[in-house]
A protein has these predicted regions:
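Flexible "arm" and connector segments at domain edges
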Residues: 1-103
């Protein structure tokens, strides 16, 4: 887990650098920081909610002995949503780091 955490921190720092290059290194206010953080958090939650739905769907499909291609499609959705959720959380962490520069 330590190696993965280090890789994620690296990605957060890269995302932070990218955001600073595009939008400046500081927020104009803590209100702006909150708004951006809240948006990223909501996007992460949306991905998590869909992921949860797909996992529940997978379990229902398994219990009903669904066709393997249907199960495969659901697993592909789970994979995609997990990746997208991780991306949103990386962006959330990067924006939290940027907000720390305002304090």
């Amino acid at each position: 887990m330590t190696i993965l955490k280090n890789r994620i921190e690296y990605d957060v720092n890269k995302e932070y650098d990218l955001a600073c290059g595009l939008h400046g290194s500081k927020f104009n206010s803590l209100h702006e920081a909150y708004a951006v953080l809240k948006e990223e958090q909501e996007e992460a939650k949306l991905e998590s909610d869909v992921l949860n739905y797909e996992c529940e769907k997978l379990w229902s499909l398994i219990k009903s002995d669904a066709e393997s291609d249907i199960i495969e499609g659901t697993l592909e959705n789970i994979y995609r949503k997990a990746i997208l959720g991780a991306c949103e959380l990386v962006q959330t962490a990067a924006m939290a780091k940027k907000a720390l520069k305002k304090i």
